[in-house]
Amino acid sequence: MSVPDFHPDAAAAYRGLQFRIKREEAANPPRWYERWLTPNAPRLRPMATPAVAALLAVALITGLALTGVAGQLVRVFQPHQFVAVQVSPSDFANGNVVLDYGQVKWLPEPPTLKQLSDPAAAGAQSGLPILSPASLPKGVTGPVSYGVVSHATGSLTLDAARLRASAAKNGVHVNPMPAAIDGSTLVVNAGPALIEAWGLSASQTEASMPTLVIAQTRVPTVDSTGATAAQLETYLLSQPGVPPELAAQIKAIKDPSTTLPIPIPKGLATTQSVEVNGVSGLLIKAAFGAGVVWEKNGVIYAVGGQITPDQVLAIAASLH
């Protein structure tokens, strides 16, 4: 399949995006998605502000684990579809406040992220196939960097007393945790994941934006020993500090147990439903590029970069 040429001024568009974001969140440290392919292993932090917790309500802490509660578990989250959720930097203005919602346990350890240059090693370590497009648009060139996130399982036991003490210590008001949620254990099974990126700088001191990313991960699952998805959503959305618009968008999700919210920068991107390889997907269009995400046969796929929506869809359809 031939992919048409495209020559956007990606650098100018990206500079404009950076300026708008930095203007609104100059006091905040870089987010996790700005450091997604680095040598540092990802760390699980207790849920932060209510807005952050609300956005992650359906997948409370993707990456957690199974320890002695399998017989009591009820599935509360296993995504097969996607919905856009409009967010702005101001929704996370207090993201530096970290609250302790309960005890986290790993089995045997937190997920690790490895950056590799060898595709065979990346495929072997992830257990996922290396995907190649039929052709690449001009401007998208190698070498390709590979990131492998290990499979992880773990558990979070929600604890009202710990949350209350953490909120008091940080000077933050939270609504009391209901008895139906207090003491529930959430078990999360996630990964592995494989990321292929074109155009990243080889220098760790020089920031760069990839021209193309192809990613895939096994569908994560979240199980609970007590609290239901509806109870978790209702409680988290009731917390002070959750923007009403954000809460309304999450409440509007018809089936939160099978739907993964995709945060979209407000005013910077639009979305639409599309068909990808015979299944429904979500296409994201922005001034500096485009992306598409879909799920098929228990794997979530994503393609994106400094390319047009038509090119994104052509690449997604040609993966082999």
Label each region the model flagged:
Residues S2-L44:
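Positively biased amphipathic helices and basic secretion/translocation or surface-docking motifs
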